[in-house]
């Protein structure tokens, strides 16, 4: 094969040398060829590096040539051209740095071989094999292990050799390309050829694609930047579908390897995600809808100009996205502080089965009827509550064949094209063709269009039903094959019904690829239809990969994905999954079927919440995760009965949600007089042929091997053998609705069961009652009213599945007929629920007849007898008891609990705060929630309900009592009446400090939570655009009252407005923008404050910086700040260390690297010291432990003097020892002590001066070079430590400085005034508290109509200076 390809390669090179002139895309300038040319090379006489090789777009797939053979031929040409020809049996090429390769983790072991477990020289004969795609039996095949290993067919040998060539080609081309030297462009072409092969057959070439990705390693981003433009060019030029194939290939790789390599593609080509997911189209739609809402509100208040009343001028509206459109006569005096969207949360329901049944009438028109399945009954009430909800499912109308002519489905911004050249995917067609003579194919399209019309009509009167269209072959394999051939029996723990075709690893892999592809199509449809605030609800075992694929595709539909901030808030995308069937896989599921098992279990952990029918199923899943999935953290909250599993940076909540029925619907039908009459007729018709005292046993289910019908009939047969006196009396009415007859295992099972029923009827007769039959067996379904009539007619309901998720039939029976008895097997989820509720216990009584093992025919028969002979009084008592329980726990409770936003790990749950560590952990979680709130508000995204619940639960927590029980109280009520003092235990260790407590004044923490809750209410109201209303909201907490607050705010705002637009803005934090907290770790910036500061920085200033004495990290400003990056620079340690973003950080260079390294080692030892129980208290008091630039601070006492002197003395001794051990001569470190803390300094060569905030301003001026002599400068502070900052700004900006001070200290005010007077600065104002300053900033922001032109006009940098050069970018914080 290789020799033939090399010969054709040489022939191809000779032909190429005489190529005609080409344009930039490699196409003949005179005539467009029918197929694009192959790879083009320069002649041998042409210098190698004089002209770069032109990268052509991907070739159009050739129908007359095998894709693999074609790719290998072209790849061999490339290898020849880069002087690395392929030699069979010998590896040749360039060496490769192993450091560049990204290898797979150790937990992905090689899959077991097909012949594993077969002894040598033995023959395995497969007597029956089912083709899982068609459900048909195929001829038996004989596997001989010796022959298989010793000889290989010619075709498989060629495949192995082809794979070797491709792997070697990838390795060689990558090695040449990554060096960026001679032939690198040609080597890139070789890699592109391999990629093209993978994209032409993504499901079949996943192994090659994996090799390509793993070889590229950390150079993937660079590779995508080079080749994705060719992918796009190919799609646009030749109508290929490579972008879609690339997206699927990446998802398939991520699913199989538990990776997230798709983010590398997004990082390389930011517009790729927006284009493929239609994000720009969604953003346009959301913005337009939001503008319409704003217009409607403005019209209601009679402020809207009629010329904007029409929807025609969309472009004009979009340009006014941030403004309220009003009449010119009533021009706005303010603009919204933020621009929010108030679209309510929708439920995006995703299921394989549709909620409707679609059929075609004889006239050719389509008819849609409401479905009747269990899923529909469960979910339809939730979906019908809002017409904007969306249900995505497959309607059974799929693509029957591969389209020969491709056409693009979206334009460059992701909008669907109005006209589609090929309408095979009928639901992508949005416009009907003009009337003309139609071909048969076009007539089929017209017919499909009529279906689309019916769907549109359906959607007008109900929720939105959107079809997911897939390739029919893929669907058959996914549904009729792996879903029902493997997953269904496996999860029911019925391995005997698993198709033997899955013993072949290659067959399993092929069907697994189809399963992934269909899941991918459902996922991408859900992502394209979802908004940030929606809840996506995935159902059942068909779609278990959707959570992982959606997270790979979208990253997050919430805050972090918009800015591509990887690694933050991964769990913000709300995706729930509910498994309607059991989760009881066989013991070898994770080993024998590892290709399927591990990816499914890992994928389930990517959902936000996963619901199981029973605690038994959840426990099985948790154990499976613990045993087989590495690097997981499993927690259990007994109060909420919730497991939380963390894996790969994601967290998943696992709950038990027993599904139920809509009680009212069944009760109303059961009470209908017509139903009662029909029930009497049924009973008379059946039991009229029996002896007195006979009992009617009734059972109804799908004709499925999981329902235990065969075991039931065997037990029924044994029942009459064991209790012959019941012959002629009792009747079993069995309804088994036939389904899946196309699947061999189902057809065989159904035939065997019907034969058994016939055998029982032939075996047992009653001479006295000759018309009596022991079994009435029907295979047709019953309408609901007639089904309920049978429930009323029965004496005993029989529900005995081998395994079932819940089985709602048992609930339907006793809801409709509470006087009936119930025979229930432990395999039913309903039995687990009733058993957990104590309905089968010695204390509460045994309210039903439990079948422990349906395979135990003797015990099963005894259960029948016990039910038949049970007294009516006992039966009525037990039935009524269960009936009351079921009526309370109905379908509404099930959906409400699953959709409850409070039930998730993302919500701060009500917790017990007893110790210092618990209190600080709680405050840290509020910081995370507040950051999410701020990002949502600043981006105009809806506020999720769980934000409010989290803050409420943080404020209302459980305070432990002295007794064992705990009571639910709030933090403020935990404090003594009239105070905000909170007393907590210092630690839980025994010893001399046992019982030692510490008291905090948490007034600021409580007050800021109250303000944030008020802010959340305001921002979600219709008044959110009114900044003055927001200021009133803050003013309601002001100690002087809202009127005085408003007046003080306006006075401060007037001064701020005089200086707008500020060129520079420097401010202190604690005491200026944030009230002082009980300790620094709890001084979390409130959400409302962060929003005000961010919007002020965005609209009213150019360069903004917060200068603080706190450090950056290690209990520093970055840990308590909630403003997103990019709004403010942070000058920590009085401006000695600066942080703009992760790539821009710098610090004062007064310290040598050796001295700083010494201090870092000292800090690490002190951290270890404070982890010891004896000294742990010092982490939580005051400023805790902080690592500044140049010194370390360790708190030793709180303001109340709570810490015992002996404890402080021991800490001092340990600190002195650590310092002396590292610096025994005292030449580098020095230790100081104040009333509240210890400080360890590095002795710097500063000529005796103390570094202050003025030096920090000077440092940032030197490094970033802002031009402070032009434009206004705003300075805010509250203490003596801020005066050097003001003085430095006055030196640089003089009278253009505007300053606001938060102080009532007359002496401090006098110092500030005198300092400003010295520099002729008269722009001074004093306020009483940080909230007034924040209110003034909000007022000034809303009343200053700035735009981007103002910002561009600012003279931020000196004419001769530029921002920091790339090569001068400071290194990251050490």
Curated annotation (Swiss-Prot):
Pfam family, one: Glyco_transf_20
Positions with biased composition (Basic and acidic residues): 56-66, 86-95
Record family assignment: In the N-terminal section; belongs to the glycosyltransferase 20 family. In the C-terminal section; belongs to the gob-1 trehalose phosphatase family.
Top enzyme category: transferase
Catalytic activity: D-glucose 6-phosphate + UDP-alpha-D-glucose = alpha,alpha-trehalose 6-phosphate + UDP + H(+)
EC number of this enzyme: 2.4.1.15
A molecular function GO annotation: trehalose-phosphatase activity
Annotated Acidic residues bias: 96-109, 1356-1368
Record region (Disordered): 28-66, 86-117, 1352-1374
InterPro entries reported in the protein's UniProt record: Glyco_trans_20, HAD-like_sf, HAD_sf, T6PP_C, T6PP_helical
Keywords, comma-separated and alphabetical: Glycosyltransferase, Transferase
Organism: Caenorhabditis briggsae
Name by which UniProt lists this protein: Alpha,alpha-trehalose-phosphate synthase [UDP-forming] 1
Gene3D superfamilies, per the entry: 1.20.58.1800, 3.30.70.3080, Glycogen Phosphorylase B, HAD superfamily/HAD-like
GO biological process: trehalose biosynthetic process
Highest taxon, organism lineage: Eukaryota
Function in brief: Catalyzes the production of trehalose from glucose-6-phosphate and UDP-alpha-D-glucose in a 2 step process.
């Amino acid at each position: 094969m290789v020799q033939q390809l090399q010969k054709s390669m040489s022939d191809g090179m000779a032909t190429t040398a005489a190529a005609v002139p080409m344009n930039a895309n490699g196409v003949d300038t005179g005539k467009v060829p029918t197929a694009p040319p192959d790879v083009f090379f320069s002649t041998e006489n042409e210098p190698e590096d004089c002209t770069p090789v032109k990268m052509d777009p991907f070739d159009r797939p050739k129908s007359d040539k095998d894709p693999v053979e074609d790719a290998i031929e072209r790849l061999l040409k490339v290898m020849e051209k880069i002087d690395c020809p392929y030699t069979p049996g010998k590896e040749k090429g360039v060496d490769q740095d192993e450091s560049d390769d990204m290898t797979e983790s150790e937990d992905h072991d090689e899959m077991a071989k097909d012949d594993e477990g077969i002894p040598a020289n033995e023959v395995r004969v497969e007597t029956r094999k089912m083709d899982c795609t068609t459900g048909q039996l195929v001829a038996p095949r004989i596997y001989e292990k010796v022959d298989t290993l010793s000889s290989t067919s010619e075709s498989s040998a060629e495949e192995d050799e082809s794979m070797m060539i491709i792997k070697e080609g990838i390795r060689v081309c990558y090695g040449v390309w990554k060096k960026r030297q001679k032939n690198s462009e040609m080597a890139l072409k070789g890699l592109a050829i391999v990629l093209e092969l993978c994209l032409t057959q993504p499901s079949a070439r996943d192994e090659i694609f994996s090799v390509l990705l793993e070889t590229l390693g950390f150079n993937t981003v660079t590779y995508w930047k080079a080749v994705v433009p060719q992918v796009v060019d190919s799609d646009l030029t030749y109508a290929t579908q490579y972008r879609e194939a690339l997206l699927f290939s990446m998802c398939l790789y991520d699913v199989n390897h538990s990776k997230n390599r798709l983010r590398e593609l997004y990082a390389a080509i930011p517009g790729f995600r927006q284009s493929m997911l239609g994000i720009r189209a969604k953003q346009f739609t959301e913005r337009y809808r939001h503008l319409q809402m704003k217009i409607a509100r403005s019209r209601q208040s009679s402020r809207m100009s009629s010329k904007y009343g029409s929807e025609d001028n969309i472009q004009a509206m979009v340009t006014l996205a941030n403004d309220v459109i009003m009449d010119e006569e009533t021009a706005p005096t303010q603009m919204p502080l933020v621009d929010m969207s108030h679209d309510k949360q929708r439920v995006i329901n995703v299921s394989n089965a549709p909620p409707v049944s679609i059929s075609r009438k004889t006239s050719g028109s389509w008819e849609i009827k409401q479905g009747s399945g269990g899923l529909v009954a469960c979910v339809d009430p939730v979906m019908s509550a809002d017409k904007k909800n969306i249900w995505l499912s497959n309607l059974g109308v799929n693509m029957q064949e591969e389209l020969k002519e491709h056409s693009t489905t979206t334009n460059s911004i992701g909008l669907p094209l109005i006209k589609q050249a090929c309408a095979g995917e009928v639901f992508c067609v949005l416009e009907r063709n003009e009337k003309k003579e139609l071909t048969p194919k076009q007539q089929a399209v017209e017919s499909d269009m009529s279906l689309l019309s019916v769907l549109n009509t359906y959607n007008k009167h109900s929720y939105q039903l959107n079809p997911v269209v897939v390739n029919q072959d893929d669907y058959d394999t996914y549904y009729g094959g792996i879903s029902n051939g493997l997953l269904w029996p496996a999860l029911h723990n019925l391995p005997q019904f698993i198709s033997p075709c899955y013993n072949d690893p290659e067959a399993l892999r092929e069907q697994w690829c189809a399963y992934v592809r269909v899941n991918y199509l459902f996922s991408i449809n859900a992502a394209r239809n979802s908004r940030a605030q929606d809840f996506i609800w995935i159902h059942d075992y068909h779609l278990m990969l959707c959570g992982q694929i959606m997270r790979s595709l979208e990253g997050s539909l919430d805050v972090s994905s918009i800015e591509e901030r990887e690694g933050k808030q991964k769990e913000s995308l709300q995706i729930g999954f509910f498994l309607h069937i059991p989760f009881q896989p066989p013991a070898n599921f994770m080993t024998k079927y590892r290709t399927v098992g591990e990816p499914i279990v890992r994928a389930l952990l990517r959902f936000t919440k996963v619901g199981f029918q029973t605690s038994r199923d959840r426990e099985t899943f948790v154990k499976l995760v613990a045993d087989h999935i590495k690097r997981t953290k499993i927690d259990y909250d007994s109060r909420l009965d919730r497991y939380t599993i963390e894996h790969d940076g994601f967290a998943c909540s696992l709950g038990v949600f027993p599904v139920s029925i809509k009680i009212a619907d069944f009760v109303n039908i059961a009470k209908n007089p017509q139903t009662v009459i029909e029930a009497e007729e049924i009973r008379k018709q059946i039991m009229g042929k029996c002896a007195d005292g006979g009992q009617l046993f009734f059972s109804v289910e799908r004709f499925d091997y999981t329902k235990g019908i065969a075991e039931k009939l065997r037990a029924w047969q044994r029942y009459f053998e064991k209790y012959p006196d019941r012959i002629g009396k009792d009747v079993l009415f069995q309804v088994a609705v036939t389904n899946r007859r196309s699947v061999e295992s189902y057809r065989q099972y159904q035939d065997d069961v019907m034969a058994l029923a016939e055998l029982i009827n032939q075996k047992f007769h009653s001479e006295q009652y000759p018309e009596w039959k022991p079994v009435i067996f029907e295979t047709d379904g019953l309408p609901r009213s007639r089904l309920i009539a049978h429930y009323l007619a029965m004496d005993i309901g029989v529900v005995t599945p081998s395994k079932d998720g819940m089985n709602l039939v048992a609930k339907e029976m006793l809801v409709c007929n509470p006087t009936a008895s119930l025979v229930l097997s432990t395999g039913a989820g309903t039995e687990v629920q009733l058993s957990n509720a104590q309905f089968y216990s010695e204390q509460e009584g045994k309210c039903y007849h439990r079948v422990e093992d349906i395979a135990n025919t003797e015990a099963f028969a005894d259960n029948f007898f016990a039910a038949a002979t049970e007294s009516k009084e006992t039966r009525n008592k037990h039935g009524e008891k269960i009936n009351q329980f079921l009526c309370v726990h109905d379908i509404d409770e099930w959906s409400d609990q699953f959709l409850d936003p409070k039930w998730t790990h993302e919500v701060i749950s009500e917790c017990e705060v007893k110790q210092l560590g618990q209190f600080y952990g709680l405050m840290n979680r509020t910081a995370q929630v507040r950051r999410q709130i701020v990002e949502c508000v600043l981006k105009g995204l809806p506020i999720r309900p769980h934000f409010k619940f989290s803050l409420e639960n943080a404020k209302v927590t459980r305070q432990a009592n002295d007794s064992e029980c705990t009571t639910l109280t709030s933090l403020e009520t935990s404090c003594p009446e009239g105070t905000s003092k909170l007393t907590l235990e210092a630690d839980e260790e025994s010893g001399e400090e046992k019982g030692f407590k510490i008291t905090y004044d948490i007034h600021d923490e409580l007050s800021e939570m109250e303000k944030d809750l008020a802010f959340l209410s305001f921002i979600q109201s219709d008044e959110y655009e009114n900044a003055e209303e927001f200021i009133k909201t803050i003013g309601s907490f002001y100690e002087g009252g809202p009127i005085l607050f408003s007046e003080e705010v306006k006075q401060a705002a007037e001064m701020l407005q005089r200086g707008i637009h500020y060129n520079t803005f420097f401010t202190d934090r604690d005491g200026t923008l944030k009230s002082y907290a009980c300790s620094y770790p709890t001084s979390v910036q409130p959400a409302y404050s962060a929003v005000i500061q961010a919007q002020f920085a965005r609209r009213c200033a150019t360069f903004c910086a917060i200068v603080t004495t706190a450090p950056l990290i290690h209990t520093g400003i970055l840990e308590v700040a909630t403003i997103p990056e990019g709004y403010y620079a942070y000058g920590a340690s009085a401006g000695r260390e600066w942080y703009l973003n992760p790539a821009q950080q710098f610090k004062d260079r007064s310290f040598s690297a050796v001295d700083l390294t010494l201090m870092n080692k000292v800090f690490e030892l002190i951290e270890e010291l404070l982890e010891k129980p004896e000294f742990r208290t010092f982490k939580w008091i005051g400023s805790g432990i902080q690592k500044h630039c140049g010194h370390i601070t360790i708190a030793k006492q709180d303001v109340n003097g709570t810490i015992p002197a002996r404890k402080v003395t021991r800490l001092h001794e340990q600190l002195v020892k650590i310092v002396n051990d590292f610096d025994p001569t005292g030449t580098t470190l020095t230790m100081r002590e104040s009333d509240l803390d210890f400080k360890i300094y590095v002795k710097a060569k500063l000529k005796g001066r103390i570094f202050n905030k003025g030096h920090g301003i000077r440092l940032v001026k030197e490094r970033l070079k802002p031009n402070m002599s032009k434009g206004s400068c705003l300075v805010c502070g509250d203490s003596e430590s801020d005066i050097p900052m003001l003085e430095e700004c006055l030196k640089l900006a003089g009278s253009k400085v505007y300053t606001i001070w938060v102080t009532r200290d007359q002496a401090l005010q006098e110092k500030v005034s005198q300092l400003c007077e010295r520099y002729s600065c008269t722009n001074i104002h004093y306020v009483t508290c940080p909230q007034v300053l924040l209110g003034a900033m909000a007022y000034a922001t809303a009343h200053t109509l700035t735009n981007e032109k103002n910002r561009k006009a600012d003279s931020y940098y000196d004419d001769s200076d530029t921002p920091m050069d790339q090569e001068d970018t400071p290194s990251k914080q050490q």
